[in-house]
């Protein structure tokens, strides 16, 4: 599947690319990148919408609880169901994901953010037409750039959804180039940090 996604990679560093999708092989690395971007964007005065995933370990459990932190309000929404330590399969709480997605979409429509950051485009968006899909559409309608993670398995669906407005990238350097093209007043450093000029 990664080979299919690699065929979708393209350079994002021009203003016409509204969605920069980071190919996620390792969830923690992508989350860390998004946290750094969000922190630097806020420190430079940019208004943000979207959500970042926070995983909280549970004592005595193999799997953590999953939360989304709304970037506009700071609200923390638990998106995983507690199905017991031995449960297998998806633990995502669809109702909680819908609640988070609606909160994000409202922020996009009412607060005119400068940047939307979403932790991932996954099964809910690709196969079910739900999740944060409407929030992405709202951002595109308002010409607000979107930074999002995507697993190789869902990269073709994201590309089908966003078309030529989407660039799928595999490294942090490409994200920095995209951010530099969208927010020219920023100098994006090699370490993945941003400093306002």
Task: Show which residues each predicted segment covers.
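Residue-level preference for the first positions of well-ordered beta-strands
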Residues: 17-21, 114-115, 145-147
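Glycine-rich, charge-decorated loop segments at or immediately adjacent to ligand/cofactor-binding or catalytic sites
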Residues: 151-166
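Substrate-engagement module of ASCE P-loop NTPases
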Residues: 135-152
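N-terminal phosphate/diphosphate-binding loop that engages ATP/GTP or pyrophosphate donors
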Residues: 31, 35-84
């Amino acid at each position: 599947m990664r080979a299919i996604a690699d065929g979708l990679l393209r350079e994002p560093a021009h203003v016409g690319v509204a969605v920069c999708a980071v190919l996620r092989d390792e969830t923690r690395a992508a989350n860390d990148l998004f946290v750094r971007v969000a922190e630097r964007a806020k420190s430079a005065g940019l208004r943000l919408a979207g959500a970042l995933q926070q995983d909280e370990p549970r004592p005595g459990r193999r799997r953590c609880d999953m939360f989304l932190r709304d970037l506009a309000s700071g609200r923390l929404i638990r998106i995983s169901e507690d199905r017991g330590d031995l449960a297998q399969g998806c633990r995502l709480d669809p109702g909680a994901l819908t609640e988070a997605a609606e909160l994000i979409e409202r922020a996009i429509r009412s607060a005119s953010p400068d940047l939307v950051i979403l932790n991932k485009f996954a099964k809910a968006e690709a196969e079910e037409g739900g999740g944060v899909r409407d929030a992405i559409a709202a951002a595109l309608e308002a010409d607000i750039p979107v930074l999002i993670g995507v697993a190789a398995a869902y990269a073709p669906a994201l590309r089908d959804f966003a078309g030529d407005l989407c660039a799928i990238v595999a490294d942090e350097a490409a994200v920095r180039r995209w951010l530099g093209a969208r927010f020219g007043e920023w100098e994006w450093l090699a370490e993945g940090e941003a400093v306002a000029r």
